[in-house]
UniProtKB/Swiss-Prot annotation:
Cellular component aspect of the GO annotation: cytoplasm
Gene (name only): coaD
Keywords: ATP-binding, Coenzyme A biosynthesis, Cytoplasm, Magnesium, Nucleotide-binding, Nucleotidyltransferase, Transferase
Binding sites annotated in the UniProt record for ATP: 8-9, 16, 87-89, 97, 122-128
Pathway: Cofactor biosynthesis; coenzyme A biosynthesis; CoA from (R)-pantothenate: step 4/5
Residue(s) at site: Transition state stabilizer: 16
Family: Belongs to the bacterial CoaD family.
Protein's name according to its UniProt entry: Phosphopantetheine adenylyltransferase
């Protein structure tokens, strides 16, 4: 069975990768889909995020990385995928994710959302926190893979403003 793990991944963190690894224990094939979110001002372009994630999962033959702008249900239909994976850190995540799952289900009854609890080591971690700490020159290497930490430092050294 195939599943989609959608998100903005701006940037991808070890918390996201924990969800990827655990989803692979349940599903035969996983599509990580970088979604364009009009409510967010990303630090990295969609293409940069796809490239960073692709580098991280290149040794996983059953993981594919893609991008999409539009409704998630349309992407699922186009790939004939019926399951969405969502990671949860806390109760506050659950409220938002539940609303999204219900909205997706109302648009297409055949789709299911599977919630995976984030490992407790990453329960505090968010892309926003990573961006905030990195923008001030802080060490984020415990929270993101080396290629992501390097990309963040490169942006900071060029004076790019990180939107929080």
């Amino acid at each position: 069975m195939k599943a989609v793990y959608p998100g903005s991944f701006d940037p991808i963190t070890y918390g996201h990768l924990d969800i990827v690894n655990r989803a692979l224990k349940i599903f035969e094939e996983l599509w990580i889909v970088v979604m364009s979110n009009p409510r967010k001002s990303p630090v990295f372009t969609v293409e940069e995020r796809v490239e960073m994630i692709s580098d991280l999962v290149k040794k996983e033959p059953n993981v594919h990385v893609d991008s999409y702008q539009g409704l998630l249900v349309d992407y699922l239909r186009s790939r004939n995928i019926k399951v969405v994976i969502r990671g949860l850190r806390a109760v506050t995540d659950f409220q938002y994710e539940l609303e999204m799952a219900i909205a997706n289900k109302s648009m297409c009854k055949e789709f299911e959302t599977v919630f995976l609890m984030t490992d407790e080591r990453f329960s505090f971690l968010s892309s926003g926190l990573v961006r905030e700490v990195a923008s001030m020159g802080g060490d984020v290497t415990k929270w993101v893979p080396p290629n992501v930490a390097e990309a963040l430092e490169k942006l900071r050294s060029k004076g790019k403003q990180f939107m929080l």
